[in-house]
A protein has these predicted regions:
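PLP-dependent amino-acid enzyme catalytic core
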Residues: 1-453
Length: 453
C-alpha cells in the first residue's frame, strides 16, 4: 500500500493564504507558533503574514541617501527561515503529484550551498521523505546544524560557495541510482514557477501604497537564479521595470567570466544556471563581498550608530534580525541601480532578503578575527562606504542582443556537459518557453487540490 504524504498548498494558496480552506489555515497558524515540524506548516509557505500583508520593510533613507524607496521583501518568516523552502516544496510536490517522487521508494537529493538544502531537509521532514543534502564543506556551521536538526543526511563536497559545480557533479552521479530523485534547484522549473508567480506577484503587492505604487527596478543576486524569475512577472505589471542580477565582484561570472572565491553565501556559483531567463535580465551588477559582511555587521551590532544617523530606533532594532550577507548584497545593488537609473521621489526599487541573521553568527565571529578592532569610528565609516557611498561603478548593461548571445553561450558551456541537448537550450531563447512553463501552474494546482480531497 502506498505511503500517504501530507499535502500542502497550491501555488495560488501560497500567494493568497487566505484562500486556503479555513480549517487548514487555522491549523497552520497554530503550527507556526507551537510546532515547527507540524506538517500544517506547509501552509505557511508564503510571503504574507496572518493578515495577508507581504512581510517587507522600506530600507531607511538615512542609510541610502536616496529620494527613491528601497523596498525589501523579508524571507526570514518562511518556515525553516528562508524563502528557499518555497521552491523546495514546489519541486517535491510537483514530482509527487506526477507520480515520480514517492516516499516509500525514493530518497530526495538536495544540491545546495545552504538555504535550499535547509528547505529540502525541512520539507522532507514534514512530508515523510528521506533527504540527503549535497553541499560544499566550507559554509557557515549554522547551515549544517539546521540540516542535521531536520533529520537529513549531509554529503559534503570540497570547497565553498564558488565550488557548487562539484555538488552538481556529485548529484548527477547519485541520480544514476533509480532510488534517488534530485530537487535540482539550478535546473528544474518549479523553482522558476514558484518565484515568478508567488514572489513576483507578492512583490507587486509589496509596493502598493509606497511611492507611486510601481516597481522601477528589481535587484536580486542569483544562486540558482530562481528569485530572478520574479522579475518576469514584475515586468508584466510594470513594463518599464528593469531587472538587475547581482554577483560578487570576486566571482563575476555573468559579467566578465570571473571564477574566483568569495564570501557571500548563497550566490555567485560560477555558472549561468539553467533556469535563469537571461532574456529579461537587463543589468549585471558586481558587489564587493567584504562590503556585504561589513554592512551585516552595521545592521546587526550598530543599532545606536544607526539611531545617531537618524534611523528610527524601532526600525534599527527590527533590522538586526532581517538580513544575511546576500540580503545586504541585494540592498547595495538596489542603491547602486537607483543611482544609475537616476530614480527620484516616488520611484521604488524592490529587492529581497532571502533569510535572516540566525544562520550567520559564525560569519561575524570569523570577521572579528580578521579585524584587529571594530571601534565605533570603523562602523561609522562602513555606514558611508557600504550604503551611502554605493556608486554606479561595476554595472554592466546586458540588454543588447550580443550580450544575450554571450550569456546563452555560457549557459551552453555550463549545461551541455550535464546531458541537456542544444535543442532544449535553444528553446530557452524564446520567451514562449518561459511562458509555457509558467502556464503549467494551473494544471499543478488542479492536481494538488484533487489529491488533497
Amino acid at each position: 500500500m502506498a505511503v500517504k504524504v501530507p499535502l500542502g498548498p497550491t501555488y495560488e494558496e501560497m500567494l493568497y493564504p487566505n484562500r486556503q480552506p479555513l480549517a487548514l489555515r487555522e491549523k497552520a497558524r497554530l503550527a507556526r507558533t507551537h510546532d515547527e515540524l507540524d506538517p500544517h506548516n506547509l501552509f505557511n509557505i508564503t510571503w504574507k503574514d496572518d493578515v495577508g500583508k507581504v512581510n517587507s520593510l522600506v530600507f531607511p533613507p538615512e542609510l541610502t541617501g536616496l529620494d527613491a524607496n528601497i523596498v525589501v521583501m523579508l524571507g526570514k518568516d518562511f518556515p525553516s527561515g528562508s524563502h528557499k523552502v518555497g521552491p523546495a516544496y514546489s519541486t517535491l510536490i510537483e514530482g509527487y503529484v506526477d507520480g515520480d517522487i514517492l516516499p516509500d521508494r525514493h530518497t530526495i537529493l538536495g544540491p545546495s550551498t545552504g538555504n535550499f538544502g535547509i528547505g529540502v531537509a525541512y520539507i522532507c521532514a514534514l512530508m515523510g521523505y528521506k533527504g540527503v543534502v549535497i553541499m560544499p564543506d566550507n559554509m557557515s556551521k549554522e547551515r549544517y546544524q539546521r540540516i542535521r536538526g531536520y533529520g537529513a543526511e549531509l554529503l559534503l563536497t570540497p570547497g565553498s560557495e564558488s565550488d557548487v559545480i562539484l555538488t552538481l557533479e556529485k548529484t548527477h552521479e547519485l541520480q544514476k541510482d533509480p532510488a534517488n530523485r534530485a530537487l535540482a534547484q539550478f535546473e528544474l522549473l518549479p523553482n522558476y514557477r514558484f518565484h515568478r508567480y508567488v514572489t513576483g506577484r507578492s512583490a507587486i503587492e509589496a509596493v502598493q501604497g509606497i511611492g507611486n505604487g510601481r516597481i522601477a527596478c528589481f535587484t536580486s543576486a542569483p544562486g540558482s537564479a530562481g528569485t530572478l524569475a520574479a522579475g518576469d512577472e514584475i515586468k508584466m505589471a510594470f513594463p518599464e521595470a528593469r531587472v538587475a542580477a547581482l554577483e560578487p565582484y570576486e566571482c563575476s561570472t555573468l559579467a566578465t567570466g570571473g571564477l574566483g572565491q568569495h564570501r557571500i553565501e548563497g550566490i555567485g556559483d560560477k555558472m549561468c544556471t539553467l533556469i535563469h531567463n537571461v532574456l529579461t535580465t537587463d543589468f549585471i551588477v558586481n558587489i564587493y563581498d567584504e562590503e556585504t559582511v561589513q554592512g551585516l555587521k552595521v545592521l546587526r551590532d550598530g543599532t545606536d550608530l544607526l539611531v545617531q544617523q537618524g534611523v528610527d530606533r524601532d526600525m534599527a532594532e527590527f533590522m538586526r534580525d532581517c538580513f544575511g550577507p546576500s540580503g545586504v548584497c541585494n540592498v547595495i545593488g538596489a542603491i547602486k541601480m537607483a543611482k544609475y537609473l537616476k530614480l527620484g521621489p516616488g520611484d521604488n526599487v524592490l529587492t529581497i532578503a532571502t533569510d535572516g541573521f540566525d544562520r550567520y553568527h559564525s560569519v561575524l565571529d570569523e570577521m572579528q578575527h580578521r579585524y584587529l578592532g571594530l571601534e565605533k569610528h570603523v562602523m561609522e565609516r562602513w555606514v558611508k562606504d557600504v550604503f551611502l557611498n554605493a556608486d554606479e561603478n561595476l554595472i554592466f548593461d546586458v540588454r543588447r542582443q550580443e550580450q544575450k548571445e554571450r550569456l546563452f553561450a555560457q549557459k551552453e558551456r555550463d549545461w551541455l556537459r550535464f546531458g541537456y541537448s542544444r535543442e532544449y537550450l535553444d528553446s530557452m531563447k524564446d520567451m514562449a518557453f518561459w511562458n509555457e512553463e509558467f502556464a503549467r501552474i494551473a494544471d499543478y494546482d488542479e492536481k494538488i487540490t484533487r489529491l488533497r480531497g
